[in-house]
Amino acid sequence: MSDKTNDDKTLSVNPKKTLTLKRPGVEQSTVRQNFSHGRTKAVVVETKKRKFSRPDEKPEVEAAAAPKPAAPAAAPQQAPASAPVSASAAQASAPQPAPVKAPATKAPAAPSAPVTKPHVAQQRPVHQRPGGQQAQRPRPADRSGMVLNTLSRSEMDARRRALEEAQIREVEERARAVEEAKRRAEEDARRAKEREESARRQAEEEARLKAEAEARRKAEEEAAKRMPQPEARSERRDDARPAPYGARPQQAGRPQGGRPQPAGRPQQGSPRPAPIIADAAPIAGKPLPQSQLRKPGQSDDDDDRRSGAARRGVAAKPEVRAPKVVKGEDDRRRGKLTLTSNLEEEGRSRSLSAMRRRQEKFKRSQMQETREKISREVTIPETITLQELAQRMAERSVDIIKYLMKQGQMMKPGDVIDADTAQLIAEEFGHTVKRVAESDVEEGIFDVADNESAMVSRPPVVTIMGHVDHGKTSLLDAIRHANVVSGEAGGITQHIGAYQVVQNGQKITFIDTPGHAAFTAMRARGAQATDIAILVVAADDSVMPQTIESINHAKAAGVPIIVAINKIDKPAADPQKVRTALLQHEVFVESMGGEVLDVEVSAKNKINLDKLLDAVLLQAEMLDLKADPDRTAEGVVIEAQLDRGRGSVATVLIQKGTLHPGDILVAGSEWGRVRALVNDRGEHVKEAGPAMPVEILGLQGTPQAGDRFAVVANEAKAREIAEYRQRLARDKAVARQSGARGSLEQMMNQLQVSGTKEFPLVIKGDVQGSIEAITNALDKLGTDEVRARIVHSGAGGITESDVSLAEASNAAIIGFNVRANKQARDSAEQQGIEIRYYNIIYDLIDDVKAAMSGLLSPERRETFLGNAEILEVFNITKVGKVAGCRVTEGKVERGAGVRLIRDNVVIHEGKLKTLKRFKDEVAEVPSGQECGMAFENYDDIRAGDVIEAFRVEHVSRTL
């Protein structure tokens, strides 16, 4: 070996080894480790020597590299194979430059790790593979003299199974350990979270208590500092006002560069005391005023004492000079604006009134004065918001919310509460409660007691009722001497007419009602608004269904009946038959020992009309009808319609009081001011007394026929009542459309109806009564499968909005005695909406019935054709299986429906694909003949099966 410099890297060539690049100062050696079953492994050990030096010494540069270690392959050649050589490691750690050969004695066979110093071990370079390039791995010596016992196959299998079971157990134990660790970690995390939450709550509570105590202490200090001392404060402000250009005084004893907080310095937010100006030299050539050169009240003796102390050598605190930075007039306003500096400025002082208010507030807080509680009577409706309740109680809504929070309820000012909760809150705040219902707005409007001393006789109200075409309107026309029938379509009365006639100087009010079945509700309203009912029965037609219905309505209303046997001039007239038929319905006329008046009349020839009127007046005299004309008007709406030129027009019958133009009235859910009163002859009148029918102009909307009306004091009351009734009607409509969830029966009905088909319609009519009759008639047409749905109905002409609604809901438009304007017609033609016009209700119902019948699914009707028995099954290419059959009953037609029956069980139903006889396609095969049949999309046929042929027909249904 030769010494080399540190930069010299030598290459050692060995024919048995690969080329290696040695690092200077590093010695390498190889040791061998023994393992079980005679296995060994060679390990390369590197040892680097490091020279330690004191911190004050400079490290010496090594002049020569470390001595070259012995060849790592020499040791294994001299030592036995069973003993690892550790001498090279010892040589590497020895300080001698020359290597020493290991003795040839046998070393103990203990596989030990390389002997290295842990604190001087050198890390491998990143690019160097461990032990791969420094030295060649020596070949293990031949293991001579060692005998391995071979295991049998059963032992090896047993060991393998034991090893596999051990591995499985190890995996399971590891999984259990992981689960246990995970569970323990989750438990620890949960407990730690609970501890943190508890500590956080405790810290928040302590912080809150500390903040409250601190705030209380600050408030007390603030109150003590702000005690009203006007004179002292003004003197202090005058004496302690800082000079604009004076230097800031320094406190004695303050070290240079530091800024400790003085002991008596007030906290932030409290008023800062005025600064005391010490002696300071003039700055920037400006002499300071005398008041700023020394403190107020300071004498020259103080200066002499201070200078004398300095001369006597007394240790005095060093005087700290003010900073040299001087702000100009503009620079003074660039600093940070704080509350303290803001309050100290002279221009921002409080006004005298603000000072007085502050003093009064402070006195009240000191004396703990409480305002006198004012108890109020709070009116509480069924539902009320918190904000409105607070306004009625003259309380703050915040106080109500705080009270509810104490009760465990989190609410906002806009939340709605019920009357019980509102009552509890109001009583808790010391108020008295007056509970009112929402319907109380209607109290005092209807059924007001009459003044008995002011009661006068009034005309009777007579309703003419009877079957269709029995002469009701003709009789009234004969009485009124006016041709009313010619104005009705088809001679049928479509809506109620109210008229007044005079007989022997006395007035009689007549109400004409429709007779056909669709106008049941209108007859019922007419009976309720009447005093006497005239039952018109044709002498040649006797009692009919609507006659019976009219009798029932009159009995239900409790009004007396006068029977008018009409058409006695006809040859087939039989008045006695009519009287006998009325006995079956408990109507006993006077001629047959009863109390019901009966008169035989002829409206066409005007026979016995005066006797009929005398009977009406006699019955009215027996009833002793009276009313108070001086009270507010009250009555019932007979009919309402929307007139193009006059707006909403309502025909009303006044039952009590007198109605004047200008009165404010409420009719159903509509209200308005009476603009005009028109009688039955089209004349404007200035007043309408009891039992007088008139038309009212001026309502905001069209009321429903049968609604009661009453005069109210002002518009606010009328608007409140109308809004309440509109809200009720809206809620009912929503509940009806959405099928509000009620009982189980209602829910089941809703489920059944949900599968029905609907026929949407938009209906516009001339008067409300006709629309109501059409709606009721269409409702009766509905079945479980189809029904008419009225999207919109109203009185008046057809407008563009009706067309838009019909287009959105895919509905048809029906006009009854009304027409569409030009814009509506153009819009309907453009959008493809059908508009149909009718003037007779029967035609309308028939057309709608026919249209609804088209929505019904057709009826499936099946006709049996015959049976055939399969004798043999043939498999034909491109056709499939073909059944060779014999027709045993009836016949089989091509294209007919078939059922495949096997053991009296239908296993397939389909259609015939082919029907052949002797390779010819035939239309049908009669009984007793053989044929070939194939099914569509079905091949599972066997000999012995029976084929049943049938024909299916779809028959359209009608309502």
Swiss-Prot record:
Subcellular location: Cytoplasm
GO molecular function: GTP binding; GTPase activity; guanosine tetraphosphate binding; translation initiation factor activity
Chain positions covered by the region annotation G2: 491-495
A cellular component annotation (GO) from this entry: cytosol
InterPro entries for this protein: EF-G-like_DII (IPR053905), EFTu-like_2 (IPR004161), IF2_assoc_dom_bac (IPR013575), IF2_II (IPR044145), IF2_N (IPR006847), P-loop_NTPase (IPR027417), Small_GTP-bd (IPR005225), T_Tr_GTP-bd_dom (IPR000795)
Region (Disordered): 1-374
Start and end residues of each stretch annotated as G5: 602-604
Location (main, coarse): cytoplasm
Biased segments, Low complexity type: 63-118, 128-138, 246-284
Biased composition (Basic and acidic residues): 1-10, 154-225, 232-241, 318-333
Pfam families with a match to the protein in the record: EF-G_D2, GTP_EFTU, GTP_EFTU_D2, IF-2, IF2_assoc, IF2_N
tr-type G domain location: 457-626
Bias (Polar residues): 27-37
Function according to Swiss-Prot or TrEMBL: One of the essential components for the initiation of protein synthesis. Protects formylmethionyl-tRNA from spontaneous hydrolysis and promotes its binding to the 30S ribosomal subunits. Also involved in the hydrolysis of GTP during the formation of the 70S ribosomal complex.
Xref: PANTHER family: TR-TYPE G DOMAIN-CONTAINING PROTEIN, TRANSLATION INITIATION FACTOR IF-2-RELATED
Protein name according to UniProt: Translation initiation factor IF-2
Organism this protein belongs to: Brucella abortus (strain 2308)
Gene name linked to the record: infB
